[in-house]
Amino acid sequence: MQFPVEIWLRGDNHATTETIAPVARDARVWTDADVVAVLEGMLRALERAKNPDAAADRSVALRGFSWIVSPFESGGVVIALELTLGAVVAGPFDVPESLLTAAIARVIDAQRATTGSIH
């Protein structure tokens, strides 16, 4: 499944658009692994915008950013991530906001549980 991501780098006056395809399935049937792939794809797109030579398979941790699933004006929902580096918004996706919000919370919590805490 291909979808657009809008990327804004902090300090820039404009956003850019890129199309990514991290998963094959439609959003309504995403598994937790698909949700992880979507979030990682969004973070990698943001990294490529800042560092075009960044490795495509660079490891990604699902922490250190704020996120929200929001309704899109023409239907569906978008996923927005914000980091110190900038922000990236993907979608729209035809899936209930509550389901996608729960899936993102679940995969972020699961990764946090496996990586431990840093003090």
Label each residue range with its predicted role:
Residues M1-H119:
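Positively charged, low-complexity terminal tracts
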